[in-house]
Regions:
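Juxtamembrane membrane-water interface segments immediately C-terminal to a transmembrane helix
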Residues: 35-57
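N-terminal cationic amphipathic segment used for targeting or macromolecule association
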Residues: 15, 20-23, 46, 187, ...
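Interfacial alpha-helical end/capping and short helix-turn segments at domain and membrane boundaries
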Residues: 50-202
Length: 202
């Protein structure tokens, strides 16, 4: 009888140990999964912050170069326009990777990035297109002999130049906001983006 009692207790202890082991294994597995997901999400957020920080830093440098170039020689000459097209190319990279933006947990930062890039893309397209149209109109003006037609073309050219300049000023004013967004990305990225600006200025 005593043997049976001890046998029962031994079996019960074994069962408790098995159940306890199963519970601990489940908790351990769950904790590992949660931790893995957190680390994965954190890594994706950091990569997204690095990506957008690099894009915005490059755009800030390119647009500053464009503004400096515009003040030398022909305002919308080949070099300035090449710079503006380079800035547009940076926006194209953003467009192709837009879903990466949602890896950033800060909704306010996401909204600021998206709004800023939209506000830059529209006037950039406008300035680039207007420059091409103005070039074509000037060619037409040279070939035009009719005084009325020439006067109409000259008026259109002047109006388009004013609109283009307004669009360019909007780009410059909007580009001034890039720095604050880049600064907001640095803690998330764990990286300072001043390096690009320092190299560009050296």
């Amino acid at each position: 009888m005593v043997v049976d009692t001890f046998g029962f207790l031994t079996d019960q202890s074994t069962l408790i140990a098995v159940v306890l082991g199963a519970i601990l294994a489940t908790i351990g597995g769950f904790t590992a999964t949660v931790l893995e997901r957190y680390l994965d999400k954190r890594e994706r957020e950091q990569n997204a912050a690095l990506f957008f920080g690099e894009i915005l830093s490059s755009m800030a440098v390119i647009l500053r170069f464009a503004d400096e170039t515009k003040k030398i020689g022909e305002p919308y000459g080949p070099v300035t326009m090449r710079m503006l097209r380079s800035a547009r190319s940076e926006l194209d990279i953003y467009d192709r990777n837009r879903e990466t933006l949602f890896d950033l947990r800060d909704a306010d930062l996401r909204a600021r990035i998206q709004t800023l890039l939209i506000r830059l893309s529209m006037p950039l397209d406008g300035v680039i297109e207007a420059t091409e149209e103005l070039k074509a109109m000037r060619v037409q003006l040279k070939a035009q002999r009719d005084p009325d037609e020439r006067a109409e073309l000259e008026a259109r050219i002047k109006a388009d130049e004013i609109r283009r300049e307004g669009g360019y000023e909007f780009i410059v004013n909007t580009a001034a906001q890039l720095k604050s967004v880049i600064t907001g990305l640095e803690p998330v990225a764990g990286h300072s983006f001043d390096r690009i600006d320092k190299i560009a200025r050296s």
